[in-house]
């Protein structure tokens, strides 16, 4: 059986054209969160990520749905399970992964890690601003 986003948003006999693009974008966002979290889980389980890891698997819809209702200029804070919110606000997945791997190229130069990832440029203030250095220029 083939599952695709087009099959999920297009039902024969119903005109969903007004909502199809929104549904497609939402499903793509949820899928991006799930794939990112599964990759993080795998890396963490193999000992390639240090510290703690709080995944948001199962919470993809709430993160993407909440961020979909925001304007681009809105700011968010999140919880310790904030990867989905970060993705929902438009974060670059490569920089997010670099942050979780404690790399200098991460959003907080590798110092924020999983729980405190932040990106002022996209309006993501992180879960605990006091412990992160917001840096949107690097």
Language-model-detected regions and their locations in the chain:
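Positively charged, low-complexity/disordered segments
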Residues: 134-138
């Amino acid at each position: 059986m083939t599952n695709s986003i087009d099959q999920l948003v297009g039902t024969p006999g119903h005109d969903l054209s007004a909502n199809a693009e929104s549904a497609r974008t939402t499903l793509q966002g949820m899928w991006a969160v799930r794939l990112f979290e599964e990759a993080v889980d795998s890396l963490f389980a193999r000992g390639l990520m240090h510290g703690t890891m709080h995944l948001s698997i199962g919470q993809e819809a709430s993160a993407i749905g909440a961020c979909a209702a925001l304007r681009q200029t809105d700011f968010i804070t999140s919880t310790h399970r904030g990867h989905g919110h970060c993705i929902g606000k438009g974060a670059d997945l490569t920089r997010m992964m670099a942050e979780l791997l404690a790399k200098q190229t991460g959003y907080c130069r590798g110092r924020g890690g999983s729980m405190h990832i932040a990106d002022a440029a996209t309006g993501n203030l992180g879960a605990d601003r006091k412990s992160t250095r917001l840096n949107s220029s690097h």
